[in-house]
Regions:
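Class I S-adenosyl-L-methionine
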Residues: 1-107
Length: 109
């Protein structure tokens, strides 16, 4: 079973990203996010597999991230700002259900 990292990338540029967030994105094989946010990090991590959805597709985005993590990948779900407050943490925990798989870690931005 893989792992799902919910990563806050800060207000939008690499210089404002935390060291911990950068490390999480480097560790991940897959980066999932809203298309605009993925465009902000894609140049920095070109070797990653990217999955994007447009705005208003949050449930679909979370389901795709969970599916990737369940295949054994380390997946980063990127969010602007703080991943626990503005991000997808609550929705991902809800969609994961009681199975406790995959492991989820919240990394604030």
């Amino acid at each position: 079973m893989g792992k799902l990292l919910i990563v806050g990338i800060g207000p939008g540029n690499y210089e404002n990203m935390t060291i911990r967030a950068d490390r999480a994105l480097k560790e991940s094989q897959v980066i999932v996010g809203y298309t605009v946010y993925v465009d902000l990090v894609k140049e920095r991590y070109p070797e990653k597999k990217y999955i994007t959805t447009p705005m208003t597709r949050e449930v679909q985005r979370c389901q795709m991230a969970l599916e990737e993590a369940r295949t054994g990948e380390t997946v980063a779900m990127i969010c602007s700002g703080d991943s626990g407050v503005y991000g997808m943490a609550a929705l991902l925990y809800e969609l994961r259900g009681e199975s406790r798989e995959p492991e989820i870690e919240v990394i604030p931005g």
